[in-house]
């Protein structure tokens, strides 16, 4: 049976690697492995998110949903050292890599968690995510609905999705589901959506 990056316990044989994240304000060397999302490079969607998302708030609880080996969580933690960054993933190997990478990068404000971990707070300031589209539309919608509801009033989520993986239909669904969304960047076939928890929404 094949192993997927959204499996809780990947069965793929270990193939350790290293990915360098080079941004104008952050440089990271991150350990990777098989069985996690994009283990061989910083994928272009995640790069778009890291380069174009609005700066995170200086403090509060920030979430990397579907953290993989930790590039988003570690960049968030670097940019907001007084905040707590929750790196959430169903994949045990991904969580282990993220914790190790945060430790090696000197980022004590990163906390890893499973999606059902009660320690993750319910008033999140920001969510950044390259969501696991391949889990299927129904599962994706349920996941996003659950986590977006945990944004504090005025909180924002930045979601990056490939156009050929349904970015435009996801944008439409967010609007129809009552989540105001705007496309704030596009590059290399990816869309970056900014979703706001408007307390006035119905």
Please report, for each region that a protein language model flagged, where it lies by residue:
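Class I S-adenosyl-L-methionine
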Residues: 3-15, 166-202
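N-terminal auxiliary segments of SAM/dcSAM-dependent transferases
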Residues: 1-24, 35, 39
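Conserved SAM/SAH cofactor-binding pocket of Class I
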Residues: 44-121, 126-129
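Glycine-rich phosphate-binding "P-loop"
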Residues: 126-138
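General small-molecule cofactor/ligand-binding pocket signal
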Residues: 31, 111-113, 182-184
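Short "lid" loop at the C-terminus of a central beta-strand within the Rossmann-like core
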Residues: 133-135, 162-167
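A short glycine-rich, Lys/Arg-flanked "PGG" loop and its adjoining helix->strand segment in the class I
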Residues: 141-153
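Conserved beta-strand signature within the Rossmann-like core of class I S-adenosyl-L-methionine
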Residues: 154-161
């Amino acid at each position: 049976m094949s192993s997927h990056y959204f499996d809780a316990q990947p069965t793929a044989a270990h193939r350790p690697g290293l990915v360098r994240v080079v941004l104008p304000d952050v440089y990271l060397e991150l350990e990777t492995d098989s069985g996690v999302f994009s283990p061989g490079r910083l994928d272009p969607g995640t790069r778009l998110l890291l380069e174009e998302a609005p700066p995170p708030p200086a403090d509060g609880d920030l979430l990397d949903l579907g953290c993989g080996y930790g590039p988003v969580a570690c960049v968030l933690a670097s940019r907001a050292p007084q905040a707590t960054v929750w790196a959430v993933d169903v994949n045990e190997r991904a969580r282990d890599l993220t914790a190790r990478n945060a430790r090696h990068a000197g980022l004590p404000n990163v906390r890893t968690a499973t999606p059902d971990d009660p320690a993750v707070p319910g008033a999140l300031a920001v969510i950044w995510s390259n969501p696991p589209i391949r889990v299927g539309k129904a599962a994706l919608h349920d996941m996003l609905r659950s986590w977006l509801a945990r944004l504090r009033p005025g909180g924002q989520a930045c979601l990056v999705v490939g156009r050929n993986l349904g970015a435009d239909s996801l944008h439409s669904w967010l609007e129809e589901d009552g989540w105001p969304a705007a496309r704030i960047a596009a590059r290399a076939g990816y869309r970056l959506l900014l979703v706001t928890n408007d307390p006035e929404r119905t």
